[in-house]
Amino acid sequence: MLLSDRDIRAELDSGRVGLDPLDPTMVQPASVDVRLDRFFRLFDNHRYAHIDPRQEQDELTRLVEVDPDEAFILHPGEFVLGSTYEQVTLPDDLAARLEGKSSLGRLGLLTHSTAGFIDPGFSGHVTLELSNVATLPITLWPGMKIGQLCFFRLSSSAQSPYGTGANQNRYQGQRGPTASRAHRDFHLTRIER
């Protein structure tokens, strides 16, 4: 079930959902707007001949920090990682989904490629997969609204929330955009004829 603004406020007020820092004006009818942080992870395309998710490739990206009042320019066709300004913390019976802002999408800005789902139990800054599909550069300002979180109540609490037991996952507690850690639990099924 998708939570309404009433339910979202109740979850925030009780402390079960954490958004830090919280700006109450960001609560929308069925979501909460989130803002862009000042950290970006750029791809160094000359370091490797190709990207292999099975291998650790530490030099694939580099962290760039802009001043709080300095813009980051995302060029046409460019893909960078960013993150939410807010640290998001979910209980074991709520999941969230990151969606883009319609007004930014109409300018050609995509906020996530595939990873819009946030598991119950997650705590950290949400990494954004920012792409410019427009034909002009897009100016990104730290602190600007960049997306929105929708919250979903599970039918029951997760037995193994994110960050616990076998799910002590790769991105729990992350601060800033975190590079891929796909190599840590890469799974490959042998495909038979």
Curated annotation (Swiss-Prot):
Homotrimer. Residues 182-193 have a biased composition (Basic and acidic residues). Bifunctional enzyme that catalyzes both the deamination of dCTP to dUTP and the hydrolysis of dUTP to dUMP without releasing the toxic dUTP intermediate. InterPro entries: dCTP_deaminase, dUTPase-like_sf, dUTPase_trimeric. This is dCTP deaminase, dUMP-forming. The keyword Hydrolase applies. The keyword Nucleotide-binding applies. Residues 163-177 have a biased composition (Polar residues). GO terms for biological process: dUMP biosynthetic process; dUTP biosynthetic process; nucleobase-containing small molecule interconversion. Keywords: Hydrolase, Nucleotide metabolism, Nucleotide-binding. Belongs to the dCTP deaminase family. The record marks 116-117 as: Important for bifunctional activity. The gene is dcd. Residues 163-193 are annotated as: Disordered. It comes from Micrococcus luteus (strain ATCC 4698 / DSM 20030 / JCM 1464 / CCM 169 / CCUG 5858 / IAM 1056 / NBRC 3333 / NCIMB 9278 / NCTC 2665 / VKM Ac-2230) (Micrococcus lysodeikticus). The active site is at residue 129. It catalyses: dCTP + 2 H2O = dUMP + NH4(+) + diphosphate. GO terms for molecular function: dCTP deaminase (dUMP-forming) activity; dCTP deaminase activity; nucleotide binding. DCTP binds at residues 101-106, 119, 127-129, 148, 162, 174. Pathway: Pyrimidine metabolism; dUMP biosynthesis; dUMP from dCTP: step 1/1. Its EC number is 3.5.4.30.
